[in-house]
Amino acid sequence: MRVSKYLLSTQKETPANAEVISHQLMLRAGMIRRNASGLYSYLPTGLRVLRKVEAIVREEMNKAGAIEILMPMVQPADLWVETGRWDKFGPELLRFKDRHNRDFVLGPTHEEVITDLIRKEVSSYKQLPLNLYQIQTKFRDEVRPRFGMMRSREFLMKDAYSFHLDVDTMNETYEAMYTAYSNILSRMGLAFRPVLADTGSIGGSMSHEFHVLAQSGEDLIAYSTGSDYAANIEKAESPMPTEPRGAATEALRLVDTPNAKTIAELVEQFGLDITKTVKTLIVKGATEAAPLVALIVRGDHELNEVKADKLDLVASPLEMAPEALIRDAIGAGPGSLGPVGLNMPIIIDHSVSVMSDFAAGANVDDKHYFGINWERDLPLAQAADIRNVVEGEPTPDGLGTYAMARGIEVGHIFQLGTNYSKSMNATVLDENGKSQVLLMGCYGVGVSRIVAAAIEQNFDDRGIVWPEAIAPFSVGILPMNMHKSHRVTDIAEQLYKDLSAAGIEVLLDDRKERPGVMFADMELIGIPHTVVIGDRNIDAGVFEYKNRRTGEKQDIPFDQLVDFLKNAVKS
């Protein structure tokens, strides 16, 4: 491709409204342009990268035995009514009526459509298992689209759905998808981690997320320093205490604490060890008999809201009780709450169950109890894992300790079970002629999100540093002053033909432009390999080669360059 016949559209200045580096660089590199909030057009450079990501995803899905189909973006509302998600989904589900006053949605996902398709097309166990996938545009009407392609309203996604009669084949397909996703991200040259994940509102028995590691990632990943164990912070298991509860050495005493509204203030003012304090949070309960529930974690720990949401006594979704309701029930406000004398169900974290001589609010404003001990001052409460893990703690497999990294979720695989097939009556006849509800798996990859995540992991102060497999072009040719030198023009044109004939994707900058601008554009759009041609190089019989990632420069003889670049691109 010649730049003179290409829509390069680079920008020197960073757009003011672009918050994250991927959004900034996709705009500056001429990859995308905004049409409306959360809606973007792909320009040629962006589309080339998107198509390369899409091709790798498609190849690995096909290799794993999945079959490609294509479902409509517009979906009839009656399918969503059938599963109950018409009412459960919030305003992010874009609903509209056609000219006949029939309800439709712009699909944010395709569970309903695929289940409807399978219940009509599959009737016998002999047709199973099946794993069908598509690469299709999705739409979610986000209240505040942010971060460019990282959280846009319209996006490209690969979603696959598998159907089974038995758990064994569902597990086999799940493992195949796990491997396929790992292969996809490995082929793209991205550092990533598969992590155990919460199944969330979708439910199901097993779930993994695939995260591209990046300091800008919204998700916190807890992983083992000694094994492959990794989990989303919401799912990571806290270790059980190994030390027994210490004996009581202090008397229970009521202390005035007028200026200690937080644990940090309490610790600072009274010289306490933060591990000898607890935080009490009041949430709404799941029953009329217990409308409020107290959740208690150690002062240096944080409540894990996803874990808390799964407690039987706690209302789901988890909702913190408002201060007015707390005061009405307890007589004190947040900052002065604790377990002693508290007349409601109490659930403590396992780490709290082994505490002794600890401090907590006294359920009277501006007062705390010091020297609290279980089974002396109050009964030992129900204990559960309700906190976030902490770096340095042992991991559940016993093979290492927790370390933390930030990640961007680009893939998610679920075992759905019968969540959708049961509500939509998707059944087949088994080998005994008996009707059986289908088991389902669901496997999603954010194709357009991978593009943004790759940039978040691969950039420097000059622009994008693409991994080889998804770069828009492999080689950039920079002829210096080619419009003034026939020698430079002739050699640049010949090199362009030779590299193209070798199957290498080349961008030849044939503009009448200053060398500084040409270099800046090549580095901004992230082409992995650049070749500079000038009269001085020609006199020496060499090309000047530069590697975008390492910055390494070297002179390569004319007759060796094509083979050198073939090897560089392959590696």
From Swiss-Prot:
Catalytic reactions on record: tRNA(Pro) + L-proline + ATP = L-prolyl-tRNA(Pro) + AMP + diphosphate
**Could you tell me which PROSITE patterns the record lists for this protein?**
AA_TRNA_LIGASE_II (PS50862)
**Which N-terminal stretch is annotated as signal sequence?**
none
Which cellular components does GO assign to this protein? cytosol
List the SUPFAM superfamilies.
Answer: Class II aaRS ABD-related (SSF52954), Class II aaRS and biotin synthetases (SSF55681), YbaK/ProRS associated domain (SSF55826)
Q: Which domain of life is it from?
A: Bacteria
Q: Which GO terms describe its biological process?
A: prolyl-tRNA aminoacylation
Q: Which UniProt keywords apply?
A: Aminoacyl-tRNA synthetase, ATP-binding, Cytoplasm, Ligase, Nucleotide-binding, Protein biosynthesis
Q: What are the subcellular locations of this protein? A: Cytoplasm
Please report a single Pfam family linked to this protein: tRNA-synt_2b
- State its role: Catalyzes the attachment of proline to tRNA(Pro) in a two-step reaction: proline is first activated by ATP to form Pro-AMP and then transferred to the acceptor end of tRNA(Pro). As ProRS can inadvertently accommodate and process non-cognate amino acids such as alanine and cysteine, to avoid such errors it has two additional distinct editing activities against alanine. One activity is designated as 'pretransfer' editing and involves the tRNA(Pro)-independent hydrolysis of activated Ala-AMP.
**Assembly information from the UniProt record:** Homodimer.
Q: What is this protein called?
A: Proline--tRNA ligase
Species annotation: Shewanella putrefaciens (strain CN-32 / ATCC BAA-453)
> Corresponding gene?
proS
